[in-house]
């Protein structure tokens, strides 16, 4: 059945789909205000609101801000609810709101639901499956224990996103991968472990993302009581970028449409950024058959002219493809070609610096995009550009929390306060802690030629100086640190025979740290500190914050540490209450330190944005990060175009993800099907990125990869087809 009031808006990248959706949303608000007599009827009856869904949280914030700007321009606001959310956020909220209904339906214990974050989920699942892992029931060739556990949990999430019962996962894997070797036994073991995991979580009221998604589509959405409440809450649904949604969202939208809600959906055939991560574009595309169809066509970037030519070059690398009548010199392309990747990174940094210095482009108009950015590449580019005073924004960079010296210092502090954690300490970590914790604005020394408080000093995100430098910290640790497994201690400074060599500031700072540790240790012994998260909060207030402006990265790390600690202790308290046990606090602290040192937890910068000047910063991102952020820049530098990762999808594809597409027949996964999938993904990537580059595309290639292997990826045909040989040098033609 086609709903005449509902609209399916289809268009390529940057053709105005979101703007059209906002237009429809504002029209709906205006029509409703007029129909309901200025909103007075809404206020009296509490009539249904509007459901607005975006693909990611960043898209949701952007859409919400744009809608708010339009409302402010109108000078009027709707008097009913406008819910802005993401698919996963919607599932989570609905499961929490209707948890009593699920408790009644599934006969669960009446625990208040507690969300479990992915890193905690990994730790709990590993502990639960320890016996199966040790006995070899869960073992896959060339796969570590950590990755295998993550794969099993991801399979549960993929099945839930498709709307597939988790009991069918072993059979689906067997149909897809065949009956070779011991794989059927492995699939059955995975299924048994997932059943055990699901029951274990439900008994304790713990909800992972996968479990919340499964509870929503399998138990909540079919429930007639919930359906009645759902359809009465929303009279219209607006979904942006539906090509990034899981298949079960189509079931949700169809229920709302059948109940009379008006729908507006946008779809990008060249999108599918989250294909391989649970999104199912083909399943959502079928929703368009039930709506009026609108197609948007608007030239954007280089796609209109060079998108079809790029696909020709992929099919036939031998041709020199360019628009008719356009000479090579007029093409908006250049190349940087070197022998080694180290040379390539340096040359790329030099060319960016030269272009900015000559005024050809601003830093905020440049994006460096790569199929995969390792830590060395990030550091090299950021260090090189920073040396030229060019700001760099590493998009969604998620470094492990433990990589921050401040976080390591706080973990060391925990090990000194709580007993039985001496095995986590060494002399270097204690010395580092002394340097970090002795920071204070009072220690800022005068800068040559400038007073201590020069104009603008208070606005700069510069951490204060340390009263204890590295040399003094080393001397203190050598003479005043008493290592011990049970109770390591920092001894009084006068234990050091030549403590006078430390100086007054260092001595006083050290004494303050020791006194604070002893005071907190006494409170721990008296059980006056409920959890280590309280101790961390006190330590940050005492030693780190000082009311000063910390660097953006350090603020993000501290906030994530506190959030992680609070979450970890909430989960631990739930488990101890359920099991009716009372573990010593130091045991939980030790497990928390071990979890952080594994490097699985990273700092997420939202909602703090790094400050830049008016010219912005050079964006550094992977393909997936850049496309997910839906950015556009005048200049693009495509790194490692000879890398096979352009074709393979890299980390943006979960294990067995194509098998979980709703419309895929259950048949063995073949190499031909894999090749077709990779080629389709590459075509989408090329069209999408070409739509996001405005004036200039620089192809960056090194003959050898980091591991010394020759690079012969599929995008090398672009280099030969678009850039003349005399321009494909280390110094590109501009």
Positions of PLM-derived features:
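Conserved helicase NTPase motor core
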Residues: 2, 6, 182-288, 293-302, ...
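Conserved helicase core region in the C-terminal RecA-like lobe
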Residues: 56, 82-91, 237-243, 560-566, ...
């Amino acid at each position: 059945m086609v709903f005449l009031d509902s609209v399916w808006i289809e268009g390529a990248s940057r053709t105005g789909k979101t703007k059209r959706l906002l237009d429809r949303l504002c029209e709906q608000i205006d029509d409703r205000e007029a129909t309901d007599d200025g909103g007075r009827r809404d206020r009296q009856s509490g009539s249904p609101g509007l459901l607005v869904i975006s693909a990611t949280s960043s898209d949701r914030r952007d859409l919400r801000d744009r809608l708010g700007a339009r409302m402010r321009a109108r000078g009027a606001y709707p008097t009913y609810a406008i819910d802005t959310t993401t698919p996963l956020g919607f599932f989570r909220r609905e499961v929490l709101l209707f948890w009593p209904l699920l408790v009644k339906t599934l006969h669960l214990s009446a625990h208040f639901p507690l969300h479990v974050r992915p890193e905690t989920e990994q730790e709990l699942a590993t502990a639960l499956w320890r016996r199966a892992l040790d006995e070899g029931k869960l073992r896959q060739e060339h796969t570590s224990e950590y990755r295998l556990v993550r794969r099993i949990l991801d399979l549960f999430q993929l099945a839930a996103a498709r709307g597939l019962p988790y009991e069918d996962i072993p059979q689906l894997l067997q149909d897809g991968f065949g009956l070779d070797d011991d794989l059927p036994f492995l699939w059955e073991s995975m299924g048994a472990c997932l059943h055990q995991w699901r029951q274990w979580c439900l008994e304790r009221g713990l909800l992972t993302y996968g479990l919340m998604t499964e509870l929503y589509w399998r138990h909540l959405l079919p429930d007639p009581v919930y359906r009645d409440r759902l359809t009465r809450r929303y009279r219209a649904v607006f979904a942006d970028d539906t090509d990034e949604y899981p298949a079960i969202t189509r079931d949700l939208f169809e229920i709302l449409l059948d109940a009379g809600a008006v729908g507006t959906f946008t779809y990008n055939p060249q999108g599918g950024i989250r294909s391989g991560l649970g999104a199912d574009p083909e399943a959502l595309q079928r929703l368009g058959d039930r709506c009026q169809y609108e197609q948007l066509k608007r030239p954007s970037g280089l796609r209109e002219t060079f998108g079809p030519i790029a696909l020709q070059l992929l099919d036939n690398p031998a041709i020199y493809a360019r628009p008719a009548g356009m000479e090579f010199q007029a093409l908006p392309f250049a190349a940087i070609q070197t022998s080694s990747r180290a040379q390539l990174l340096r040359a790329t940094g030099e060319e960016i610096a030269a272009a900015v210095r000559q005024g050809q482009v601003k830093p905020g108009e440049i994006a460096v995009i790569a199929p995969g950015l390792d830590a060395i590449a990030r550091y090299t580019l950021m260090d090189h550009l920073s040396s030229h005073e060019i700001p760099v924004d590493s998009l969604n960079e998620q470094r492990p929390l433990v990589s921050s010296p401040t976080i390591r210092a706080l973990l060391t502090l925990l090990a000194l306060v709580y007993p039985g954690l001496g095995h986590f300490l060494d002399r270097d970590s204690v010395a580092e802690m002394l340097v970090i914790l002795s920071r204070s604005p009072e220690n800022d020394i005068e800068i040559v030629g400038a007073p201590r408080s020069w104009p603008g000093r208070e606005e700069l995100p510069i951490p204060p100086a340390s009263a204890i430098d590295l040399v003094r910290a080393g001397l203190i640790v050598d003479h005043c640190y008493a290592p011990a497994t049970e109770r390591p201690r920092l001894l009084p400074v006068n234990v050091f025979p030549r403590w006078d060599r430390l100086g007054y500031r260092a001595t006083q700072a050290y004494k303050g740290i020791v006194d604070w540790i002893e005071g907190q240790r006494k409170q721990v012994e008296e059980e006056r500190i409920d959890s280590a998260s309280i101790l961390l909060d006190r330590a940050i207030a005492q030693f780190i914050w000082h009311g000063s402006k910390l660097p953006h990265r350090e603020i993000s790390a501290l906030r994530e540490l506190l959030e992680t600690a609070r979450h970890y202790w909430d989960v631990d308290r739930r488990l101890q209450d359920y099991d009716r046990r009372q573990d010593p606090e130091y045991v939980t602290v030790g497990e928390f330190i071990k979890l952080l040192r594994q490097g699985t937890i990273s700092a997420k910068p939202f909602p703090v944005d790094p400050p830049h000047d008016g010219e912005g910063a050079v964006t550094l991102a992977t393909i997936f990060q850049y496309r997910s952020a839906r950015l556009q820049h005048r200049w693009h530098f495509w790194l490692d175009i000879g890398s096979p990762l352009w074709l393979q999808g890299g980390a943006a594809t979960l294990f067995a993800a194509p098998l979980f597409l709703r419309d895929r027949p259950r048949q063995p996964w073949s190499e031909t099907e894999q090749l077709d999938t990779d080629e389709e993904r590459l075509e989408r990537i090329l069209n999408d990125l070409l739509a996001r580059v405005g004036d200039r595309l620089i192809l960056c290639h090194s003959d050898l990869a980091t591991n010394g292997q020759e690079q012969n990826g599929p995008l090398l045909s672009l280099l030969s087809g678009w850039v003349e040989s005399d321009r494909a040098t280390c110094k590109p033609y501009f």
